[in-house]
Amino acid sequence: MRVGIKVLGCPKNEADCEILAGVLRERGHEIVFDVKDADVVVLDTCAFIEDAKRESIDEIFSFIDAKDQYSYKLVVKGCLVQRYYEELKKEIPEVDQWIGVVDPEEIANALEKGTDLVPNRPETVYRYRKRIDLEERPYAYVKISDGCDRGCTFCSIPSFKGSLRSRSIEDITHEVEDLLKEGKKEIILVAQDTTSYGIDLYRKQALPDLLRRLNSLNGEFWIRVMYLHPDHLTEEIISAMLELDKVVKYFDVPVQHGSDKILKLMGRTKSSEELKKMLSSIRERFPDAVLRTSIIVGFPGETEEDFEELKRFVEEIQFDKLGAFVYSDEEGTVAFNLKEKVDPEVAKRRQEELLLLQAEISNSRLDRFIGRKLKFLVEGKEGKFLVGRTWTEAPEVDGVVFVRGKGKIGDFLEVVIKEHDEYDMWGSVT
């Protein structure tokens, strides 16, 4: 069976699909990278917010339109299916097979049988198997846990991802060791909430233990941690990230808002002052630390006063990177039933206003790197420039660095930063 895999959604889906590709190859199937060569196309979907659902539906119909030309079987899997299986099966009969949130071995079994598989409870924590790169790049996402027990009122993820389920430190270490042998230079740890890693297995927050284990591995590489829930970002986790030399000093902390009223409605436990104190303490200990966050505007009940409070919060913290998203009303969440919905046009205006403010802040924050030497990871080439990132940027969500000089994908180079705009930097090899 020749299988093509198309991934939508978050980096956790990318990690899952690379494991699935490895399982299928182990079973004798061929992984192809062009749908015209495939007997089966597997489309992995996202169902987090309305935009993600719309993108998934659009992609399903794009692949349906191409079926007659290329004669492949279309299999749709993942979060959208886990959440809306009955409706999808009824409304889109052109799809040949539906698979929910399932362990890669079980997905492979279902593909071989040709039967639908949507469990009542998600099953996505797997033991490590050899991965196959679906894209050529010098970094890899490693999923350390799945599911979430936090109960944020706006979030639908627990309804289709289930409760927290962590992989063992030994299993994750095995995966990372293999990735390093294959030449990966950056290991990016992902989960719905990385701060909760290990609570179910070890009865404690085990992220510091995992980081220490990975930091002890041989080789020159970066370790990056994403999705640090602010309510449970402890002093021990912060200290481990600041003290371990291979862990980049990059803190992805999705605070979601800066108004105490809205934070409480969101089900968050830390106040804006507590958030400020925590984030400021990171900068006090490591002034160059990069702080990234995510913000939701237009949450039910958000007034102009709340929004102004949010802007003051953002100005005070001076985040290096910030993603701003309009609230998505998701059925099955607590927030779905809240009154005082914000007009979509008002929410969109607030998003644009916040992003303009952040562009000024980001531009100012990058000034500190002008004239300095930074370690640079080559990811490709664009015209006369090498393109890649320093430790200050995460892939896909942040800017990039354009560098004059020679190098190949996966090289670490020392570069001098010469200029920047709000998001990207330019420099040259020293």
Curated annotation (Swiss-Prot):
Residues 367-430 form the TRAM domain. Catalyzes the methylthiolation of an aspartic acid residue of ribosomal protein uS12. GO terms for biological process: tRNA modification. Its cofactor is [4Fe-4S] cluster. SMART domains: Elp3. InterPro entries: Elp3/MiaA/NifB-like_rSAM, Methylthiotransferase, Methylthiotransferase_CS, Methylthiotransferase_N, Methylthiotransferase_N_sf, NA-bd_OB-fold, Ribosomal_uS12_MeSTrfase_RimO, rSAM. It catalyses: L-aspartate(89)-[ribosomal protein uS12]-hydrogen + (sulfur carrier)-SH + AH2 + 2 S-adenosyl-L-methionine = 3-methylsulfanyl-L-aspartate(89)-[ribosomal protein uS12]-hydrogen + (sulfur carrier)-H + 5'-deoxyadenosine + L-methionine + A + S-adenosyl-L-homocysteine + 2 H(+). Residues 134-365 form the Radical SAM core domain. It comes from Thermotoga sp. (strain RQ2). This is Ribosomal protein uS12 methylthiotransferase RimO. It is found in: Cytoplasm. GO terms for molecular function: 4 iron, 4 sulfur cluster binding; aspartic acid methylthiotransferase activity; metal ion binding; protein methylthiotransferase activity. Belongs to the methylthiotransferase family. RimO subfamily. Binds 2 [4Fe-4S] clusters. One cluster is coordinated with 3 cysteines and an exchangeable S-adenosyl-L-methionine. Residues 1-116 form the MTTase N-terminal domain. [4Fe-4S] cluster 1 binds at residues 10, 46, 79. [4Fe-4S] cluster 2 binds at residues 148, 152, 155. It comes from the Bacteria. GO terms for cellular component: cytosol. The keyword Transit peptide does not apply. Keywords: 4Fe-4S, Cytoplasm, Iron, Iron-sulfur, Metal-binding, S-adenosyl-L-methionine, Transferase. The keyword Iron applies.
